[in-house]
């Protein structure tokens, strides 16, 4: 958004509009962020940049409650996941303490054809990755 300060909001792309709305929400410094698909309309880089920023805000003591539909993003950036279907909570996942077996069992309640595996990046950090079967 750098350099777009005087640009009319209505002329921005959908992704730029989403970033503006989220920036305004984050700057308000509310103790609780309620976010409905904050990653919608964002490209890959901005999606992960935004999620990392939300993660940093939470680590500073604020709370974020998000509705997201990507199991990959949920596993990477969320501490706790509520798995919902038709407005009913089917199960919860703690991404820090639940084993892969438990996560896969719980994810199968919503997603039939995925498997969560662990992999290590070049910096030797372990990530949980969703693989379609």
PLM region descriptions:
Residues 48-60:
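Helical segment within the ABC ATPase nucleotide-binding domain
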Residues 33-36:
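Catalytic Walker B motif of ABC-type/P-loop ATPase nucleotide-binding domains
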Residues 100-133:
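ABC ATPase nucleotide-binding domains
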Residues 8-12:
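Conserved ABC ATPase signature
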Residues 81-94:
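H-loop (His-switch) and adjacent beta-strand-loop-beta switch element
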Residues 43:
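ABC-family nucleotide-binding domains
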């Amino acid at each position: 958004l750098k350099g777009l300060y005087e640009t009319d909001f209505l002329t921005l792309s959908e992704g730029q509009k989403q970033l503006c709305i989220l920036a305004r929400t984050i700057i308000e410094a509310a103790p609780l962020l309620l976010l409905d698909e904050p990653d919608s309309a964002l490209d890959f880089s901005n999606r992960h940049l935004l999620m990392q920023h939300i993660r940093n805000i939470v680590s500073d003591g604020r709370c974020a409650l998000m509705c997201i539909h990507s199991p990959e993003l949920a596993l990477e950036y969320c501490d706790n996941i509520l798995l919902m279907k038709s407005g009913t909570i089917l199960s919860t996942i703690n991404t820090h303490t639940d084993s892969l077996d438990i996560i896969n069992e719980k994810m199968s309640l919503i997603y039939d054809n995925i498997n969560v595996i662990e992999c290590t990046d070049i910096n030797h950090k372990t990530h949980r990755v969703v693989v379609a079967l």
